[in-house]
Amino acid sequence: MTIMTMIMKMAPSKSALIRFNLVLLGFSFLLYTAIFFHPSSSVYFSSGASFVGCSFRDCTPKVVRGVKMQELVEENEINKKDLLTASNQTKLEAPSFMEEILTRGLGKTKIGMVNMEECDLTNWKRYGETVHIHFERVSKLFKWQDLFPEWIDEEEETEVPTCPEIPMPDFESLEKLDLVVVKLPCNYPEEGWRREVLRLQVNLVAANLAAKKGKTDWRWKSKVLFWSKCQPMIEIFRCDDLEKREADWWLYRPEVVRLQQRLSLPVGSCNLALPLWAPQGVDKVYDLTKIEAETKRPKREAYVTVLHSSESYVCGAITLAQSLLQTNTKRDLILLHDDSISITKLRALAAAGWKLRRIIRIRNPLAEKDSYNEYNYSKFRLWQLTDYDKVIFIDADIIVLRNLDLLFHFPQMSATGNDVWIYNSGIMVIEPSNCTFTTIMSQRSEIVSYNGGDQGYLNEIFVWWHRLPRRVNFLKNFWSNTTKERNIKNNLFAAEPPQVYAVHYLGWKPWLCYRDYDCNYDVDEQLVYASDAAHVRWWKVHDSMDDALQKFCRLTKKRRTEINWERRKARLRGSTDYHWKINVTDPRRRRSYLIG
């Protein structure tokens, strides 16, 4: 009897213990699920940040190029007074979908309001507690070229590149936010509206809030609601993350890890996104073995080039593929081509290593008929390669000398500088997206390319970009045309082992010259592109190819006639570099005919 009584007394205790264990097990399962499905930010999305010498979080010098800090302070004081004296506030009505996007949970809903000081937010209180996000606005004296200078000392020979400060809110003082609402400046259609620093600042404030203080769903996405006539910057807020659009309201659900990666990089091209050389000097390359050892391949990636309208770059594309394979890359090589490339040459391109994909050309509606750049917008087809998460585009007049796989760790748009705040589109890191392709195509009749080609156009679409070292896409030119510049660059072209990652051949291409010397020397207007050292480097790659591929680099009779005519003119005008005196031994000087 005593034993039965004890068992009966213990039964409720065991039942309670079992219930407690089940609850604990369920909680542990939920926690494990959340961790398991959290996208890894250590390899694909954020590994690029480990190379940054001065990131968005750290670049805070006291002087903006040519602008005294005192002037900025005074200007910002004026901005504050303007805000305080704003008498007529705009009554801001919420979008119709406001209720459905707010997830009600424990505690009061918190809504962060950015750049809303001049708005009447009375009606918003029914949705939750509105929190004004305070930050100091950039001065009107702060110009785009301060963030995107034409030149920086990449090798740090005389100075260490730094970026001017863009003020941000005090994030540590803020609580978690259920929603970030942003009033985005839009000065369209004023000239230069895309490169307004305040526009960039507000986009960055929104991105930082979403990444650092935004509550996330099970997909680790936060919510950002923009109010603007202009679309938020697609360089920061991808159009793929646009969930709803209603009048001037834009609802985004960005992936937090993607935002974190972008925010880890310098705020402009004022510093390198990828410093390849150690502080000891340009000859000491960073040891990347640890990064490469830790790197997995969670995404599909490829190198891509494009051929269209003629076969004049077939030889260049063959040589490019061979140079990439010599770097031991394991990424796919994709070649986009139109119907202008013959079957014979397509077979040669495939034999060189390219996987072929046919495209339909895209015409620039503002180009003159039959002009050289009439179909240069065909390059936009790159964004339709959506079976790849990331691609690196490389022009067919480039050879690669060192492995470039590291660039896959960097976001769109990463490239090398060209002129002023413009990047060079010869090598670009791209994230394919049908949505982005549609955005690019939709503005063809509106955007006027400064150079009539894809480079000028893309620089108006992606104005916020990340500077890669010029040695990643080393241009074969000598703009100052000084002996010092020529000596430095020619030494880099000839260095063994290679000190540049890729050489971009401007002017007459190597396969359109005799192999004996760079034929740019024969034309006065082309002298800025002339380099025998770079010429020899290209032919070294060519000579390593199979004979069956080399024959596609033969000269046409027409081109041979042009070369001989230019040599004759150089002799008649007494060109003092005397390249016209060089005895031509190139066997292609006789066997000059078209293949296929």
Curated annotation (Swiss-Prot):
It is a single-pass type II membrane protein. Mn(2+) binds at D395, D397, H504. Its EC number is 2.4.1.-. It holds the Pfam family Glyco_transf_8. The record marks K379 as: Important for catalytic activity. Disruption phenotype: No visible phenotype under normal growth conditions, but mutant plants show reduced xylan substitution. CDD domains: GT8_Glycogenin. Keywords: Cell wall biogenesis/degradation, Glycosyltransferase, Golgi apparatus, Manganese, Membrane, Metal-binding, Signal-anchor, Transferase, Transmembrane, Transmembrane helix. Substrate binds at residues 395-397, 424-426, 451-455, 504-509. Its cofactor is Mn(2+). GO terms for cellular component: Golgi apparatus; Golgi membrane. It comes from the Eukaryota. The chain crosses the membrane at residues 17-37. Its main location: Golgi. One of its GO terms (molecular function) is metal ion binding. It is an enzyme of class 2 (transferase). InterPro entries: Glyco_trans_8 (IPR002495), GNT1/Glycosyltrans_8 (IPR050587), Nucleotide-diphossugar_trans (IPR029044). It is found in: Golgi apparatus membrane. One of its GO terms (biological process) is plant-type secondary cell wall biogenesis. Belongs to the glycosyltransferase 8 family. Glycogenin subfamily. Glycosyltransferase required for the addition of both glucuronic acid and 4-O-methylglucuronic acid branches to xylan in stem cell walls. In association with GUX1, is responsible for almost all of the substitutions of the xylan backbone in stem glucuronoxylan. This is UDP-glucuronate:xylan alpha-glucuronosyltransferase 2. It comes from Arabidopsis thaliana (Mouse-ear cress).
